[in-house]
Amino acid sequence: MILFVRDLTVIDAAYLCPHRGVVGESWLVDIELTGELNEMSMLFDFAKVKKQLKSIIDAEVDHRLLLPQKAPETLIEQAAPGYVFVDFLSEDHTIHLHCPEQAFAVIPASEITPETVTAYLLTLISNQLPGNIDGLKITLRHEHIPTPSYH
């Protein structure tokens, strides 16, 4: 059985790029769950899917600065309790931040891409799904805008 949710939410976030500095991004999120029907003959209650998965995504990456933890340009240090120092040192940009921990999502990757954010979300969400769910697919995509836009 497959349950597909198109446009579950929109991730509005920023990330650090060694060439462009701080870059804003918006991704539409689609989710596909596969598995066996439960005792109520449902894969997963549709209302719960939307609420639970959207809340995880919103809490973890929406309206945050996404940090590429494994990038050679990134240095993350604990500051005072609840605060973090971030230094991002590239040939083109030097960025120094001192912010509350909740301002960031630390992505275990060398760069921020839809694929690395998807892998991060798969890890977070997979642990929160009921036992009858055996497959999870997440797609991050840009909204098609037929008029000129800047990215």
Which residue stretches match the model-derived regions?
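Charge-rich, low-complexity N-terminal segments
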Residues: M1-H151
